[in-house]
Amino acid sequence: MKDFIGIYTNAVDPNLCDWIVKFIDQSCFVDVGENDFKETSWRQDKQVLLETFSPIEAKHLQNFVVECLKNYINECAPFISTYTYVSSLSLIQKTKPMQGYHAFHSENTNWQTCARTFAWMVYLNDVEEGGETEFLYQQKKIKPKKGTVVIWPGGFTHSHRGNSPMSDKYIATGWFQPDQGSLREHMFKIS
């Protein structure tokens, strides 16, 4: 893996993917662009923190992602395999056709996000046209396929964006950061 982008197909149980898609379709908690708290003109998607409303399913999802992180570290950087990481949330998103967040960005650009070592994403459905995750410097586009986990470094070297989907796109996303002792219930030892 020369580009440090780990792609793990069929890594998440398709039944869990279907459950999360149904969950977000039936929810009406946060709709970016219509919510006063997050109203923006540059982002249009529906977001829900899975842990808040369904902690059991969130834990199942995290377990699948952690297995992929173990593989990722063994492939890319085995010398950090003894480190302990936390992933404190699973943000699930629904993006309607031609909507989303299309600006290139990275995951650890300010003091609130600087500890994000790795980003992760799970595609919860297949998208036939558009909707790729595009990495700027790697010149790589990843097509959304249900159950696929993608893991990459959180820094500017892996600036990325979501391209406009032509049909509904569902993802779960989050971050791994080094353990600083405050989130023990979300700790994952990688060795």
What are the functions of these language-model segments?
Residues 1-84, 191:
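Non-heme Fe(II)/2-oxoglutarate
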Residues 26, 123-127, 155:
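Glycine-rich, acidic and aromatic/proline-enriched surface loops and short helix-turn segments
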Residues 81-84, 90-96:
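Acidic, glycine-rich loop-and-strand cores that form catalytic or ligand-binding grooves
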Residues 84, 111-114, 143:
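Extracellular/lumenal carbohydrate-interaction signature centered on repeated Trp-anchored short motifs
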Residues 92-95, 110-129, 176:
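Short, conserved beta-strand element in jelly-roll/cupin
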Residues 101-109:
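Cyclophilin-type peptidyl-prolyl cis-trans isomerase
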Residues 116, 129-191:
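Catalytic core of Fe(II)/2-oxoglutarate
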